[in-house]
Design a protein with these regions (language model features):
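Acidic, metal/ion-coordinating pockets
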Residues: 20-310
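Positively charged n-region of N-terminal signal peptides that target proteins for export
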Residues: 1-5
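Bacterial N-terminal signal peptides
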Residues: 7-16
């Protein structure tokens, strides 16, 4: 724990320094592309009464200014969006109301990672509804498709001559959920399948930067597992420029593998868990520059009243 605290302290100082050094660069280089990533977003259980009483805007009120400054904002959506109950037999089953989806877009969210262990909570029909409601609201779903091949296709963001491909996958089993190669589903590949997809894309589009948003690791563990470290090394070697992790519900360290940045876990963001470590989260803003360099800044948040605060 002491080592982890030191890492976080250094990360905070690094975040401040990066924020200072990249702001002038971004102003001078209008073609830089910035993508902001958040931790886990839940819109049910303890968050639901707050959303109903005060609205979605309240949940993101303090972080919305950061959303507005980025070219894209990617959340990890840990809940299906559907008005029809069709629960899967799981320990924890969530559902968000479709009427809230437009408000997510209004606060500045542009992309939602669907490849996690909770968007499946209301079955295939819930997944399909989630995809539909996100699209109708103008939010791009990630990690979803009608076949494994489609699920493994990235979403590409473009600004000027900058292009960034975002892959989204979950690399762990899901309780009472069977992944089929054909039919609507989330991206749940093997490590080999994901690595090969990154390798193939990198070889086919060498000028496009690659970000992999992963649901992985062990819940409530402050250090990445051996499996996380091994997969991160494989993905970095295969061409991933950055890896963004979710699922542990706590912050995990930042690492650099060659030229690749690895953010093992961003922790929670909009969530209702109570242990102190689950009340901390982090936003990561990746900046892709025209000289092919990548910089980042981190913004730490404290979760109070189930919403991120500064």
């Amino acid at each position: 724990m002491r080592w982890f605290s030191i890492v976080l302290a250094v990360s905070c100082l690094t975040s401040f320094l990066f924020a200072c050094s990249t702001s002038s660069s971004d102003d001078a280089n209008e073609e830089s592309l910035s993508i902001l990533f958040t931790g886990d977003v839940l819109l049910d259980r303890g968050v639901r009464p707050i959303a109903e009483a005060r609205g979605i805007g309240y949940l993101f009120e303090q972080v919305e200014p950061f959303f507005r400054k980025a070219d894209a904002v990617v959340i990890n959506l840990e809940v299906p969006i559907t008005d029809t109950l069709s629960p899967v037999n799981k320990k924890f089953v969530f559902r968000a109301d479709s009427r809230w989806t437009p408000a997510l877009r209004q606060v500045g969210i542009t992309h939602a990672a669907m490849a996690n262990n909770h968007t499946v909570d209301q079955g295939v029909s819930g997944l399909q509804a989630t995809y539909r409601h996100l699209k109708e609201a103008g939010i791009t779903p990630l990690g979803y498709g009608i076949s494994t091949a489609r699920q493994l296709k990235p979403n590409v963001l473009t600004k000027g001559n900058q292009r960034v491909a975002i892959f989204n996958a979950i690399t762990m089993p899901i309780e009472n959920w069977h992944h089929a190669d054909e039919g609507p589903g989330i991206c749940q590949p093997s490590a080999d399948q994901l690595t090969e997809a990154i390798q193939h894309y990198h070889a086919s589009w060498p000028g496009v930067r690659i970000v992999v948003v992963l649901h992985w690791g062990v819940e409530f563990q402050a250090q990445p597992s051996i499996g996380q470290r091994m997969l991160a090394a494989r993905l970095a070697e295969s061409g991933a420029d950055a890896i963004i992790g979710h699922h542990p519900h706590v912050l995990q360290p930042i690492d650099t593998l060659g030229q690749s940045f690895v953010f093992y876990s961003l922790g929670n963001f909009v969530f209702d868990q109570h242990p102190p470590m689950t009340r901390e989260g982090m936003m990561v803003n990746l900046h892709f520059h025209s000289d092919a360099s990548i910089t980042y800044d981190t913004i730490r948040v404290q979760i109070k009243n189930n919403r991120p605060t500064l």
